[in-house]
């Protein structure tokens, strides 16, 4: 098997649904053969590792540990979903106090155990804030820490697909701006539908203005809708991390360098 790198990737929060999905995605996409799974909840972590072993990925060195020093030592890449998850009735901002404390400790652990890490991706919400906290406490360069608000633009694309009844490949350059939360802004200005600007379609019989306003609300509340239906968000984040790092069209993993917001 040919991998993108042989350097160590550590997945923090690997016993959770998002973390375990990220681990499987990393293996499927052949990011690296050297993957370490970390979670403080050892029984569930072992269960995730066993499931991945049973997938029989060839040529991989998959390890797991509940010791943060062991997990981070030698890691060149880290992806963390190791914060508390949002539950029904909560906003991402409701998670701030607890997850800010987790992010601060995570940053301190990076500084202590893997100061030579090349890149860190922070997934847990509110991602723009927790990522900044990790950056400050880890002592890394802004370009070395990214946060992931990677679903909103695809949610916009998906809502347009459902509304217009056309393939996703015919809807490009979808963008959302601001925080990955209820206050995000959904714009039509960059989006093209079958080669035509979305702004020329809105407020026409094809998409009345009220329908566009309703569609924006569905995009903004997309995560809440899934939580209401399922109780949690599981699968999208892992694939989005991969897509972002590979430069997927319409998505951005944003370095915390002061220029980019959640896109």
Segments predicted by a language model, with ranges:
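C-terminal substrate-binding/catalytic lobe of Rossmann-fold NAD(P)-dependent dehydrogenases
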Residues: 138-143, 153-263
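Rossmann-like NAD(P)(H) cofactor-binding subdomain of soluble oxidoreductases
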Residues: 91-159
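Conserved glycine-rich cofactor-binding loop
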Residues: 15
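Generic hydrophobic/aromatic pocket-lining and core-packing "Φ" positions
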Residues: 23-24, 107
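Conserved N-terminal Rossmann-fold NAD(P) cofactor-binding segment
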Residues: 6, 31-75, 84, 90
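N-terminal Rossmann-fold NAD(P) dinucleotide-binding loop
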Residues: 19-20
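Conserved S-adenosyl-L-methionine
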Residues: 28-34, 139-142
